[in-house]
């Protein structure tokens, strides 16, 4: 089995962090703890598990941050090392194509009765991701027992598998996981018709969020903050009414909502802000552009 394996190696992690800071995103992988290795395939943890042969696996923003040493160590206790990255996966099980829902909740961990979150169907908020018969791991791609998409083989619980229709290409199917995250965020925001929605960030999740907003046809206006020219073009193509560079989002929202500025805050602002960056700076920006009693 060929696999890219991320090991727990603090000196290499620090080196990758320094390299990415000096040379830019993606440069840390050359000196970081990721290695291409030959290894034994992961064992099936139980009878409800199957082996999956990945066909395509995505490179998530969280994967890039991990490889560049920029990810927070806050989640280290719910990750087990060494692990094979890759949680956006389309693959084959006995000739049938599937996508993987990566969360390793109570069902996958053999925990009965399930925690309150899993019992209500909110498996993404599982309270037992470090317990059960698996090593700790928020999801496939961060658990040493399951393997991940950056390999020839991984194992998955039957509850994680969803069939891929013949009409969907592998390239489209590998986007199911990030698209589902975006759709979930849009639905959870309970956006009212005619609302102004600001989307901060135009990476994969940000662009999927813009597309989800327009597909559901709820907001009156979508304002997207995008760093790079190609992201700005894609955001507009996917339905954003107004697209601004990160430093111009407040001004754009102010004009759209006809708000006034008091200090660095708006008197009005967007009804809903969806933060697709997840940094301290983006949270601060979200609070600056949302209206009083709005939603972030």
Where are these regions (language model features)?
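Adenosine-nucleotide cofactor-binding segment
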Residues: 196-202, 214-283
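Helix-to-beta-strand junctions that scaffold the AdoMet/dcAdoMet cofactor pocket
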Residues: 290-292
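NAD(P)H dinucleotide-binding glycine-rich loop of Rossmann-like/cofactor-binding domains
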Residues: 76, 87, 106-200
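N-terminal Rossmann-fold NAD(P) dinucleotide-binding loop
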Residues: 86, 206-207
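Short glycine-centered segments of the SAM/dcSAM-binding site in methyltransferase folds
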Residues: 196, 294-295
């Amino acid at each position: 089995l060929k696999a890219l394996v991320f090991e727990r190696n603090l000196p290499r992690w620090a080196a990758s962090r320094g390299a990415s800071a000096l040379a830019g995103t993606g440069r840390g992988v050359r000196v970081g703890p990721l290695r291409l290795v030959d290894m034994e395939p992961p064992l099936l943890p139980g009878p409800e598990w199957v082996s999956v042969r990945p066909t395509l696996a995505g490179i998530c923003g969280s994967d890039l941050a991990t490889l560049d040493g920029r990810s927070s160590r806050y989640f280290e206790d719910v990750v087990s090392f060494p692990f094979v990255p890759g949680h956006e996966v389309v693959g084959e099980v006995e000739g049938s194509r599937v996508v993987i829902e990566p969360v390793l909740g109570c069902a996958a961990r053999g925990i009965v009765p399930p925690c309150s979150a899993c019992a209500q169907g909110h498996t993404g908020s599982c309270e037992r991701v470090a317990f059960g018969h698996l090593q700790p791991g928020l999801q496939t791609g961060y658990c040493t027992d399951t393997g991940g998409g950056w390999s020839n083989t991984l194992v998955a619980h039957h509850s994680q598998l969803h069939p891929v229709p013949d009409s969907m290409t592998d390239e489209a199917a590998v986007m199911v996981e990030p698209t589902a995250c975006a759709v979930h965020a849009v639905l959870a925001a309970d956006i009212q018709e005619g609302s102004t929605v600001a989307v901060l960030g135009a990476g994969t999740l940000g662009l999927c969020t813009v597309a989800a907003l327009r597909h559901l046809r709820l907001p009156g206006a979508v304002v997207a903050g995008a760093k790079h020219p190609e992201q700005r073009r894609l955001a507009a193509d996917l339905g954003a009414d107004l697209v601004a560079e990160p430093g111009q989002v407040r001004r754009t929202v102010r004009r759209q909502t006809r708000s006034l500025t008091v200090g660095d805050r708006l008197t009005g602002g967007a009804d809903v802000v969806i933060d697709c960056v997840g940094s301290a700076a983006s949270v601060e920006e979200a609070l600056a552009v949302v209206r009083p009693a709005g939603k972030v």
